[in-house]
Amino acid sequence: MKTVINRTRETDATAALLSSRHCLLCGAEELEIVLDLGETGLANNLPAAGACGGEPVFPLRLARCRRCTHVQLADRVAPELLYGHYLYVSSASSTLDRHLRSLAGAIAARTGPGPDGLGRSLDIGCNDGTLAAHMSRLGFQAHGIDPAENLAPLARARGIAVEVDYFGREIARSLRNRLGAMRVLTATNSFPHIPELNGYLEGVAELLEPGGVFVIEAHYLLDLVEQCAFDTIYHEHCHFWRLEPMMALFARHGLEIFDCERLPVHHGQLRVWAQRSGAGARPVSGRVAAQCA
């Protein structure tokens, strides 16, 4: 059964807009606009018939950093407007549900059981708990975190303990004190949504077990260009990733990417597997260098 959640919200569009003058990865004030899609409404924010005319619109522009080559949104919408009452529900797509079930199996195969079984996992941006529920069924002690208050009851109905908050260093420290370190951290299709990634990755480093894995999936810039997938550009997606800038960012936070995969889902994504730098738990796959070539 598909779940549909509607939202009606009034806002001052000017007050809700945050413009970036600096690169969200390296901090350089060397951004150049590479694509301007004009002003658009928020994705999935479709008013009922007869109620059109008052929806806010915001600039939608891509900028490239001349220094580190990262591509990001030039203008961002305030997160409380985007995520306070979130519209997209993972379980509404049977294709995505199968994809996340497959991901859970791949994670279990890679990590394997320890003395305490498969251990604890946390899905960052867990939405309605679809991935966390698949992890739980495999034997993980699955948890979730998501800022959308309206989605938490859907995840809890699946038996997932959900923290309603944005992920970062402080909440990671709190979770570690209460639950312990996590063997697995996941962020599927939520990693591109995070504007300020330094605090986020500090949280990952705080919460991840020494031999644990951090798995993300994110829209891949090359696929966006090759497939002209402009429909993946909207206000929630702050970043459009290549592997090299991501590797440099992770390294600054003591994390090492040891494998990557290109996926066809969502017009093309990159799945990245990371661990603590120097952990030595897993060798770096040749696919990492090949993807950077």
Please annotate each region the language model reported.
Residues H267-A293:
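Flexible, glycine-/basic-rich loop-and-beta segments that form/coincide
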Residues F214-H239, L243-P245, F250:
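Short, glycine-/aromatic-enriched active-site segment of Class I SAM-dependent methyltransferases
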